[in-house]
């Protein structure tokens, strides 16, 4: 007898909660939920960040001790576009290790390792950067002044940074983001 009473209580509670939920949804009107920050299907169609961390050259665990993320200053781009924009004859001459695309020139959030990363060579200090030979440079395609990176770029950059920190033992205080990073 107590089992039947318990079943009735559970069914009544279920009916009340479903009815309440239906009234709440009707009160909200015909406004569908806003689109998410990014489409998960496009996010998962990108290559794994783990693959981008691998390189053709041998990787020493103590080779890198710092990460710098900065904006390209452009609204679109990829490795080839940035090389031509900088007047370089070959994309291999870019002075950073990774490019994170924004959907204009490459898939949104696409992580493109440069030849510098593949060969495990250091960036060369220039007028815009004065890092050390143990700094990994990540270029995020974004103007950076009034336009910020896409949410997908932010998530993929953070995933890349986390992976690099794990592989090379880089400490959080050795990661430098742009001042207006989200």
Where are the regions a protein language model picked out?
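Hydrophobic membrane-insertion alpha-helices, especially the h-region
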Residues: 9-27
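N-terminal Lys/Arg-rich, disordered targeting/topogenic segments
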Residues: 1-7
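Catalytic cores and adjacent binding grooves of peptidoglycan-active enzymes
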Residues: 172-182
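Active-site-adjacent loop/helix surface patches within enzyme catalytic domains
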Residues: 31-60, 66-173
């Amino acid at each position: 007898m107590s089992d039947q009473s318990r079943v009735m209580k559970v069914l009544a509670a279920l009916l009340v909660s479903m009815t309440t939920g239906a009234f709440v949804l009707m009160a909200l009107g015909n406004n569908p939920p806003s689109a998410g920050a990014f489409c998960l299907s496009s996010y998962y169609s990108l290559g794994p960040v783990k693959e981008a961390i691998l390189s053709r050259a041998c990787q020493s665990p103590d080779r890198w001790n710092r990460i710098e993320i900065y904006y390209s200053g452009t609204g679109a781009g990829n490795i080839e576009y940035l090389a031509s924009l900088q007047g370089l004859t070959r994309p291999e001459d870019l002075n950073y290790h990774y490019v994170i695309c924004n959907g204009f020139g490459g898939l949104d959030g696409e992580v493109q390792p440069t030849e510098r990363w593949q060969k495990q060579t250091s960036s060369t200090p220039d007028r815009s950067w004065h890092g050390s030979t143990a700094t990994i440079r990540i270029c995020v395609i974004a103007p950076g002044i009034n336009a910020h990176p896409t949410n997908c770029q932010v998530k993929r950059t953070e995933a890349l940074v986390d992976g690099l920190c794990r592989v090379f033992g880089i400490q959080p205080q050795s990661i430098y983001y742009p001042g207006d990073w989200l």
